[in-house]
Amino acid sequence: MAIRLYRAYTPGTRNRSVPKFDEIVKCQPQKKLTYNKHIKKGRNNRGIITSQHRGGGHKRLYRKIDFQRNKKYITGKIKTIEYDPNRNTYICLINYEDGEKRYILYPRGIKLDDTIISSEEAPILIGNTLPLTNMPLGTAIHNIEITPGKGGQLVRAAGTVAKIIAKEGQLVTLRLPSGEIRLISQKCLATIGQIGNVDVNNLRIGKAGSKRWLGKRPKVRGVVMNPIDHPHGGGEGRAPIGRKKPLTPWGHPALGKRSRKNNKYSDTLILRRRKNS
């Protein structure tokens, strides 16, 4: 993924960088694979803010991505590599031999007219999907299922990759991008390779307007709000929060308090927690 740097001909471009989009094909998305996306703007069905700092943004069409990869034993060809406004990575349009078309996540290194397949005995090549039990140790994978047949739920962000580090019985041990080491059933499917756009974390937005295009609004500190708006608000002048511990706008513990449930069913499958938890 190449990065384009701007000259400082305006304050907004002084530190701005964007992808060069060398890999993608300029084309319209498939109509049958798109539908309108309702932007919730951080509100629930009653209009109450449940997630702050969201709203606005450019209109988007949602591209339906094939996370299940359940079209087995039929080869498909990479027709296009397209931009997707709903995620940081690109997507690929697959033309299958029977005429069906589907979108998949863009694996790093795949090229136009390459062939992919999903089956139990698929070769270990980039873009192919097969069960974890048929993959050798050390294989780099993405779009990993947690429950067999449910579709990929892990390792779908730009530049991410997981590795198979052990097999024992009916379980496979994976090292996830977060540093977590987790057990997954050998029957689960995964796709070979790393997700594209590995340098997405090196991009610099450059100006506040670019954040607004993405639907992200300014963040206001709770300590400068009124007491009705935030538990940290109020006071005369610059005052401390006035509480023993920091709280969220809804009064729950914040800044370091773990929100994961105790005795969750998957605790026995997590051998090591992620690095930042």
Swiss-Prot record:
Chief place where the protein resides: plastid
Cited SMART domains: Ribosomal_L2 (SM01383), Ribosomal_L2_C (SM01382)
One Gene Ontology MF term: structural constituent of ribosome
InterPro entries named in the record: NA-bd_OB-fold (IPR012340), Rib_uL2_dom2 (IPR014722), Ribosomal_uL2 (IPR002171), Ribosomal_uL2_bac/org-type (IPR005880), Ribosomal_uL2_C (IPR022669), Ribosomal_uL2_CS (IPR022671), Ribosomal_uL2_dom3 (IPR014726), Ribosomal_uL2_RNA-bd_dom (IPR022666)
Family matches, as Pfam families: Ribosomal_L2 (PF00181), Ribosomal_L2_C (PF03947)
Keyword Ribonucleoprotein appears in the UniProt entry: yes
Similarity remark: Belongs to the universal ribosomal protein uL2 family.
HAMAP family (alphabetical): Ribosomal_uL2_B (MF_01320_B)
Quaternary structure annotation from Swiss-Prot or TrEMBL: Part of the 50S ribosomal subunit.
Protein name in the entry: Large ribosomal subunit protein uL2c
Organism: Marchantia polymorpha (Common liverwort)
